[in-house]
């Protein structure tokens, strides 16, 4: 679901951040749920705007999610509330951000999200609800 372009951009940003951060304390706190919500809304609105300008979905997702990824990588050391203080790897973080961005974008511009993506997101959501009920 997530483009290779995003992963390449995110990897470059993470590398640049680590180079710039040398000599600084390595201990960074996980993003709070409130911060994650803010980053999610910003990335979703950006995705929606890119779609309205005619950018294809995968590129729009990359555009929207890059800032989110950068904030979590740079400010929070790849740590999110659900990671229990441990840094996520690049793939896990980018996949989670893609999912969160897409789900939030469904609230703002559902008409600009491909039907196939909507169907996959709904199926994943239904599966999580089903698993949570057991």
Could you tell me what each predicted segment is?
Residues 24, 63-134:
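Compact alpha-helical subdomains of small soluble proteins
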Residues 5, 29, 58-59, 96-100:
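Alpha-helical interaction segments
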Residues 4-14:
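Sec-dependent N-terminal signal peptides
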């Amino acid at each position: 679901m997530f483009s290779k372009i995003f992963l390449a951009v995110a990897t470059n940003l993470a590398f640049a951040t680590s180079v710039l951060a040398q000599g600084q304390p390595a201990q960074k706190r996980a993003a709070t749920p409130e911060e994650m919500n803010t980053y999610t809304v910003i990335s979703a609105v950006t995705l929606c705007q890119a779609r309205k300008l005619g950018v294809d979905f995968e590129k729009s997702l990359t555009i929207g999610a890059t800032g989110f990824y950068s904030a979590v990588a740079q400010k929070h050391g790849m740590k999110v509330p659900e990671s229990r203080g441990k840094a996520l790897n690049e793939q896990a973080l980018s996949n989670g951000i893609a999912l969160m961005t897409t789900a939030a974008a469904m609230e703002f511009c559902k008409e600009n999200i491909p039907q196939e993506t909507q169907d996959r997101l709904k199926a994943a959501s239904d599966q999580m609800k089903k698993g949570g009920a057991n």
